[in-house]
């Protein structure tokens, strides 16, 4: 049983010096204690069954990366789920190489997600301004958004507050300050470069349908409703890439829509739901098929294949099938460029 109990007051009155107002009585899981680098290495060797061939190298890596990011982030791949120890033969170097592989994956995906982000920024600013004009008061006007439903109203109010923050006071962006100072106005095409992918995606989702349709027509075989779902997922993955979180096993609570590529790749289904390519890393690979032009997409897939092949050729601590399973990739994922989008 866990109970909150107030400490006894000293006879002289007042609260106990240096004590919390309440303490926990009963059986609890104690917070993990601090370990120095040598203790961390000993724990990995003796308690976690991890081979460490070069302790000096291991210590240097832990200084650069941190125990939590490296071991906490990548332990599940090579651990026995029953014993909570690493599988026999797993080395510290195996964990480090997996960490570096994921880092390279983040860099690759982020580079192409930024291309999508820039395209959405360009198109949203173009079609919004085409309809409403270049004065900043237009994108600060709630009537220029789809102001139906309480949720939309709250989201629009929050978005406009963000936009106002850029144009009503000095910012760190010289081009915004220059436009405001010289012209007394910051057109949307100037502002969008400072906005995050999340900001511009939210703006797209809150725009009237006619503007959404015009934007979506720049992407083959994707309608405005599908675009909303795709952008929601891509924003989440972009943030994972940008913030250095573990990417290759990441799953979102949101999903991209069922697209023709799912069917053409004959992705397995559980009931009516596709097993892969909905909220995992492969969902991004599929979404990029529709959101990038053909040249960029071919370059992306070429780089992705090379990165995966290099890792698998160099390391046998995880099989190709295991890696694909963790990433949400079907075995025939390499065929994705053979199929038309529709």
Could you say what each language-model-derived stretch is?
Residues 1-236, 248-342:
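Extended intrinsically disordered or low-complexity regions, especially N/C-terminal cytosolic tails and loops
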Residues 244:
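Acidic/aromatic/glycine-rich contiguous surface patches that form carbohydrate-binding/processing clefts
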């Amino acid at each position: 049983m866990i109970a909150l109990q107030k400490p006894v007051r000293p006879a002289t009155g007042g609260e106990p010096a240096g004590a919390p107002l309440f303490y926990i009585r009963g059986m609890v899981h104690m917070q993990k204690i601090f370990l120095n680098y040598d203790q961390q290495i000993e724990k990995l060797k003796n308690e976690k069954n991890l081979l460490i061939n070069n302790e000096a190298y291991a210590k240097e890596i832990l200084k650069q990366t941190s125990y939590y990011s490296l071991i906490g982030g990548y332990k599940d791949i090579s651990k026995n789920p029953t014993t909570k120890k690493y599988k026999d033969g797993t080395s510290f170097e195996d964990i480090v190489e997996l960490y570096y592989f994921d880092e390279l994956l983040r860099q690759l995906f982020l580079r192409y997600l930024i291309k999508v982000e820039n395209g959405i920024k360009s198109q949203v600013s173009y079609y919004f301004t085409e309809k409403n004009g270049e004065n900043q008061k237009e994108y600060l006007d709630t009537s220029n958004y789809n102001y139906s439903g309480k949720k939309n109203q709250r989201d629009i109010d929050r978005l406009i507050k963000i936009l106002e923050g850029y144009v009503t006071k000095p910012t760190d962006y010289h081009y915004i300050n220059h436009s405001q100072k010289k012209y007394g106005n910051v057109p949307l095409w100037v502002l969008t470069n400072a906005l995050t992918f999340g900001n511009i995606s939210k703006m797209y989702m809150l725009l009237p349908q006619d503007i959404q349709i015009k934007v979506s027509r720049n992407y083959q075989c994707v309608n405005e409703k599908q675009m909303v779902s795709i952008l929601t997922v891509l924003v989440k993955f972009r943030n994972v890439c940008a913030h250095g979180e573990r990417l290759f096993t990441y799953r979102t609570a949101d999903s991209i829509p069922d697209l023709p590529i799912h069917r053409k790749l004959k992705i397995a289904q559980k009931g009516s739901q596709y097993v892969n390519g909905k909220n995992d890393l492969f969902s991004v690979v599929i979404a990029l098929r529709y959101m990038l032009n053909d040249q960029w997409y071919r370059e992306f897939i070429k780089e992705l294949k090379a990165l995966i092949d290099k890792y698998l050729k160099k390391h046998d601590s995880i099989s190709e099938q295991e890696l694909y399973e963790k990433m949400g990739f079907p075995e025939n994922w390499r065929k994705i460029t053979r199929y038309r989008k529709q």
